[in-house]
């Protein structure tokens, strides 16, 4: 057994404007090459666009999008007797949030358009309304888990 101390899980501080932990996670996920001010600018512009388009609080729209995009189950590769099985496992809360943030950013970036803020805002709005590529990815993940339900007894 290891004798090393287990480090505590560190969480980023809440952001300055919305005082939200989720927004700071989004900012740190958009971050490239350490340019945090640019990442903050993109997120806050996207939230302004959401406010103009939906006439709702952008934080509630964003939280709804995260809830809609969070997967319940996923598949993990498990090697048993020389063959690899895709074993369905439940997703923990933090991982589900992380996956949904990752998918929203990825599919927002893949949208056609100029500004990342506009693309991100549109993806968040679509995800909050249960449409878009992020929701397709979640459903695809659930279908994979459903198809491999027979291997559920190979749990970790």
From Swiss-Prot:
InterPro entries in alphabetical order: Ribosomal_uS7, Ribosomal_uS7_bac/org-type, Ribosomal_uS7_CS, Ribosomal_uS7_dom, Ribosomal_uS7_dom_sf
Listed PROSITE patterns: RIBOSOMAL_S7
Subcellular localization: Plastid, Chloroplast
Single GO cellular component term: chloroplast
Reported function: One of the primary rRNA binding proteins, it binds directly to 16S rRNA where it nucleates assembly of the head domain of the 30S subunit.
Quaternary context: Part of the 30S ribosomal subunit.
Listed name of the protein: Small ribosomal subunit protein uS7c
Protein species of origin: Phaeodactylum tricornutum (strain CCAP 1055/1)
């Amino acid at each position: 057994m290891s004798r090393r101390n287990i480090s505590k899980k560190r969480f980023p501080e809440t952001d300055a404007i919305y005082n939200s932990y989720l927004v700071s996670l989004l900012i740190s996920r958009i971050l490239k090459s350490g340019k945090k001010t640019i990442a903050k600018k993109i997120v806050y512009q996207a939230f302004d666009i959401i406010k103009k388009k939906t006439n709702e609080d952008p934080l509630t729209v964003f939280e709804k999008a995260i809830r809609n995009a969070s997967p319940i189950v996923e598949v993990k590769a498990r090697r048993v007797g020389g063959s690899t099985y895709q074993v369905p496992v439940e997703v923990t809360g933090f991982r589900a949030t992380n996956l949904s943030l990752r998918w929203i950013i990825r599919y927002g970036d893949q949208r056609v358009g100029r500004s990342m803020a506009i693309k991100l805002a549109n993806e968040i709005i679509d995800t909050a309304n249960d449409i878009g590529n992020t929701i397709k990815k979640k459903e695809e993940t659930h279908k994979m888990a459903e198809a491999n339900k027979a291997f559920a007894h190979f749990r970790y």
